[in-house]
Every structure is written in structure tokens, then in C-alpha cells.
């Protein structure tokens, strides 16, 4: 099977990889130490990169997550600049950060299913 990955998908994967390198090697902000980039999606015209992140053991509403959001927003220009330097793109995409709630939602759904299955009839 010869499935070719689309250019936006390849660029999104490379941006995710690049951001992880930047976070782990080049940032000194302690609020970003435990941040993990879970996914990156990019618009078809490659102008906007939507980046999802999480911190293990932390919910979106917890203070460490809120601090990380503030730090990422403050440093988004730095991240964009570094992406531009490290990747050979005609246009460096705008970077938008969002806390990834998939794990939280999955945990909540599992809990609801467990309760429903073990409810006394």
C-alpha cells in the first residue's frame, strides 16, 4: 500500500517535533518544564498551526495548566521565530496553543461507563 502523507500533515508533524525540541532545549521558563505537545494541526494554506498540549496529571483548570497557557502565549512569538529559523517554509505559521482535554474527557467517559455498568438494578 503506497499512501502518501499530505504536505499539511507532514508540516504539522515537523512543527510538533520542532516545538518539542524548543521546549526541552531552549526554553528556561519553569512553567513549561512539564509541557508535552500532544498534537499539531495546520491550516491547508499552512498559515495557522493549532498546537495542543498537556501536562501529565494536571487538569485544564488547575493552576499549572493556566500558568503554562500564559507562558506559551507570552512566548508564541519566540516559538514562531524559531520555527521559521529551523524549518524551510515560505510562510511561518501563526502558532495557537490550546490545552488538550482529550485525556480528561476519556477519563470522565470511562468513569460514567463504569458507574452505569455497576449500578444496582
UniProtKB/Swiss-Prot annotation:
Coiled-coil positions: none
InterPro entries: KH_dom-like_a/b, RbfA, RbfA_dom_sf, Ribosome-bd_factorA_CS
Keyword entries, A-Z: Cytoplasm, Ribosome biogenesis
Pfam families: RBFA (PF02033)
Compartment(s) where it occurs, according to its Swiss-Prot or TrEMBL record: Cytoplasm
Disulfide bonds: none
Major location category of this protein: cytoplasm
GO CC annotation: cytosol
GO MF entries: ribosomal small subunit binding
GO biological process: maturation of SSU-rRNA
Function of the molecule: One of several proteins that assist in the late maturation steps of the functional core of the 30S ribosomal subunit. Associates with free 30S ribosomal subunits (but not with 30S subunits that are part of 70S ribosomes or polysomes). Required for efficient processing of 16S rRNA. May interact with the 5'-terminal helix region of 16S rRNA.
Family: Belongs to the RbfA family.
Known partners and oligomeric status: Monomer. Binds 30S ribosomal subunits, but not 50S ribosomal subunits or 70S ribosomes.
Protein name as it appears in the record: Ribosome-binding factor A
Species of provenance: Hydrogenovibrio crunogenus (strain DSM 25203 / XCL-2)
Gene that specifies this protein: rbfA
Amino acid at each position: 500500500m503506497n499512501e502518501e502523507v499530505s504536505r499539511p500533515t507532514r508540516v504539522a508533524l515537523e512543527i510538533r517535533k520542532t516545538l518539542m525540541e524548543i521546549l526541552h532545549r531552549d526554553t528556561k521558563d519553569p512553567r513549561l518544564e512539564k509541557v508535552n505537545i500532544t498534537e499539531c494541526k495546520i491550516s491547508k494554506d499552512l498559515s495557522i498551526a493549532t498546537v495542543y498540549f498537556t501536562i501529565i496529571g494536571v487538569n485544564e483548570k488547575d493552576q499549572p495548566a493556566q500558568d503554562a497557557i500564559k507562558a506559551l502565549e507570552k512566548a508564541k512569538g519566540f516559538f514562531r521565530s524559531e520555527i521559521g529559523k529551523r524549518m524551510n517554509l515560505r510562510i511561518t505559521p501563526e502558532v495557537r496553543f490550546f490545552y488538550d482535554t482529550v485525556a480528561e474527557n476519556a477519563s470522565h467517559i470511562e468513569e460514567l461507563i463504569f458507574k452505569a455498568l455497576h449500578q444496582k438494578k
